[in-house]
Amino acid sequence: MRVPRLSWCGISSFGFRHFDFGARILARAPLLKLKVVPSVETVCPSASGGSSTTPMPHDLPKAYDPTAIEDHWAEYWVRENLFAQPTPKPGSTSTHDGSASEASGRRKSESDGQSPFVILLPPPNVTGSLHMGHMFEHTESDILARWHRMRCDRVLWVPGTDHAGIATQMLVERQVVSEGTTRQKMGREAFVERVWKWREHYGGTILGQMKRLGASVDWQREYFTMDERLSVAVREAFVKLHEQGLIYRGAYIVNWCPRCQTAISDLEVVYDEHKGHLWEIRYPVIGDDGKDTGEFLTVATTRPETMLGDVAVAIHPDDDRYTHLHAKMLRLPLTNREIPVILDEWVSRDFGTGAVKVTPAHDPNDFALGQRHNLPSINVMDETAHINAEGGAYAGLDRFVARKKIVEDLEAQGLLAGIKDHTLNIGHCSRCKTIVEPRLSLQWFVKIQPLADKAIAAVRPDAEGKKAIRIFPEQYEKVYLEWMGNIHDWCISRQLWWGHRIPAWSCAVCHKMTVAREDPSQCAHCGSEKITQETDVLDTWFSSGLLPVSVFGWPNITAENRADFDTFYPTSLLVTGFDILFFWVARMIMLGCWFAGDVPMPDGTKRELKESVPFREVYIHALVRDANREKMSKTKGNVVDPIEIVKQYGTDAVRFTLASMASPGTDIAFNIARTEGYRAFANKIWNAARFIFMNVDRAAEIDIKVDPAVLGAMPTVGADAPLEARWIVAELHATVANVNKSLEDYRFDVAAHLIEKFFWGDFCSYYLEIVKLRLDFSDPAKKTATRAALTMLIQVFEVSLRLLSPFMPFLTEEIWHTVYDGNPPAKSIALTQYPQSDNSKIDHGARGAMIVLENLISETRALRKDIGVEENAVVPIEVCAGPGLNASIGGGYEPFLRENLAIVERLARASEVRFVQQISAGLLRRHAYAGDVAVIYEATIDVPAERERLTKDIAKYEKGLASAERQLGSEGFLAKAPLHIVDGLKKQEAETRLLLEKARAALAALPG
């Protein structure tokens, strides 16, 4: 009869199938489930035991199928609300020391000793679907959230979506047009209602994808930026800034998108280099008698269509060429309008002809010039960039059609002096790619400098050298400060219907504005009921910039309703991309510092800047590019769809790929081959689990039992334990220490490589194979040794699963639940404690000794590959021990190898190990630590063919090495090449040099 597995409640110890205290009872009573008190060492306070909702027991199938596993656990995590963080009870708020230098922004809670770790998800557009940038960002955030949760921190990761004003309105407008109507025909109210319906039906795509990919967010706190509670915060912020004199309305030059028909911010303009022209136009000079003198002042322009709105021509006061034209009047070509010549030192004498047309309504520099000289502004284009009535005969023409027509007319009248080629940067709308038009428009602005001053102070060190906010990598801190130091007032109004409508009402009687928190019924100035609300909406970034305060209850922070704010604000960390550093990050810092600063601390004292910031740290992640480091775009056809890759390889493999490549400050060259490799890694772990379960079953059948009390905590060994046990424990402690340190430093790549190296390299490739030698179920005399080996195997495997869990949550969850036969002590491995190391448990001698064995085994394996030995073939090897000694291996190389002969023979697939004074003639050899090793293979080697192959390889390696050395020796190359290119070339050089040395050695060893 097969003995059933044992289930028991204890996060710290695996409920492995058979243990000391009940194997005989279990054999008689297959349905009995025993319970054992867990070791508190690995239990987080928030962890709870299994429940009736726990999945039914199941064995690990032979084949690893990530899709089936991931669908199941993704649904389970959401259904069980495993990652929910409830509002703290009154009085259980956290204490703050306000220092961003504290590791990962962690803070201790007085009530339970837990440290809040709070992340705000950068809200994706409600119109969006997951792309590789999202998955990369979510992977990093989720690793950190799961890691902190397993460190028993109070983790809150808040999800949500942005209403995305322009993008959403454009999408719904296209749908409306396809139905044969327009938003204008529908009217504002009906159109906005249509957008809300669209959002209800299609707006949750990306969040659904996040759920499928296992993001450990608190779904109960999901927000939408136009939710009622957030809308209240938006209106309060606008009104408060207006009351403080920091919001004003005025006519200024803005970036106008003719396609979106709205103003857009400087950050929403993308500049591309284009080859254009510089048109030189003759402006007739008017004499004192009001008649043309026959002289012309030639003006250079890149936009001749805007000349219809010229109000002056400016020259430098010290330009001797034009001294005689001071105070003269000119006749504006094609319009017959008279305009003055003005003097301004802003004019560059070296550009064009040194005379510039002044068009205040269509150029920001000209607008400033017009303000200085009290010039009028003539707007000659409408919202669609067509010439308006001010353009006379050109009215109704598209701007570029008008340009062509104007140039033709100028030439026909002899007023076109010349055309020169000219390269210029042209701004495009980042959403619709339409060329942006600088346009004079009545807009709402935030007087930004007072807010910026606080945001700058938050990032700069204070008198004690501490920063309220740390930006990492540090180069982005400099970029942030430079941008903030040159910031301009923020245009916050958008000519859209979808968004937060500006809470301002104009009066038809007194013509003043009423700004109010609640919709007014009459003018606040004259009492008239003839008031009309502003039609514009607020910039999307205004509402999203308030999220760190608004999601935690601001502005309604009262004594009864402040637990969330006091516990979770400031948040700990923001993980985001460089592309929204100024769009979003800077604005959150400005608005957060400004508004949170007015919220008293829990004890009633004034909130200092360090407690007003929206987050303690900002981690700027890299961009995900294709395998050739090209930016992904639909145009290039190189876009990688993460959902499709996940379907093929599994979420865990894609997550681990992204984590392994996440080096701070270096863009990721996503390569599907890496994902294939990590899919194999996941399969390796799966097979290791099946091997362990199989051997636990076998052991139980002969009454070999494992004491559950030893499981769960970090394993320890005595000095008399076998080498492999002392070594694997040392490696485990060292790996755990380094992984924790790497995650504290946001080195996801280093942490991933450490885990891979340990789990695949140390545990699976070496330790598991050595343990097979110790598991002897047939010899009663070896029962104690078998039990010890099996116990250590299970201990190390359990810790390894917890170590890997934040990176591969689905795989580890499945194996963990299977270990417990579907009745685990907690609902998830994510609620267990993350491994913690003890440096005193690292046996450096054992590590050094295993390096010797690993070196011999790896060199032997390489030799087998070189001479074509079949993978499963067992053949003799020769070992020539050198004179070198090492403290790790005691008396010498040969005695050490003889002591561990069984390990060498098994892992090197050697039928025997022959110790010789000299490697036999004709054998290929490799240097292995303190000696040489050769493989004796009774197969005919075609020596001439092998010599020819090696000669070609040597020539190839020499050529490649010379090329790499030439590039690395070039100062010009080193100065201009990106760091990742230089590092890659150095790595390539080292690898090529090693291959060359091995090929030369192999050639020299050939007989004849």
Residue ranges and their predicted role:
Residues L34-M132, V155, A417, S430, ...:
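Non-catalytic terminal extensions that flank enzyme cores
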Residues H428-C432, V624-N628, M632-P715, Y820-P825, ...:
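Catalytic adenosine-cofactor/nucleotide-binding cores of aminoacyl-tRNA synthetases and other
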Residues E676, H817-G1008:
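C-terminal low-complexity, glycine/proline- and small-hydrophobic-enriched intrinsically disordered tails
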Residues E345-W346, H373-A385, L496-G499, P503-V509, ...:
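Alpha-helical recognition segments enriched in aromatics with Gly/Pro capping
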